[in-house]
């Protein structure tokens, strides 16, 4: 800016003023995205945006959408929204999503959102193992798997094999199969 100073006799003098306009204020995060609980099997169940263990680009619209419900602004403009996720545990998996909001001058602000992913739906048994009639005088005649009066490990294959014909499924996968037998009316 150039200033000109004049007196009554027409004499003038000028000077220059420098005005620096600089945005030094970080963007505002009025509301961090809300905590979310998702039914699922792990981080692959997270959308809006997808899980990312490395810094990933997003948008102000996604930060503020109906899923996340964050609120951000800047005295100039928000120019960048990124996030990075850190997952801990299984059943449930708890994800800490760190959002970073930036403006054109490189000012940033961050906040953390918690996303919990958990499988709360029990496995489905579509068909229980069929009734079997076995020739023999005691429980030692039972095979596939052997008779056990205490909880014993088995496998999905044994439950579903040609002898037992059971059918079971789970959206997150079946991780164990056990069985226990009770003998009723066995020949002496």
Regions found by a protein language model. Give the residues of each.
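Proline-threonine-serine-rich low-complexity tracts
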Residues: 1-188
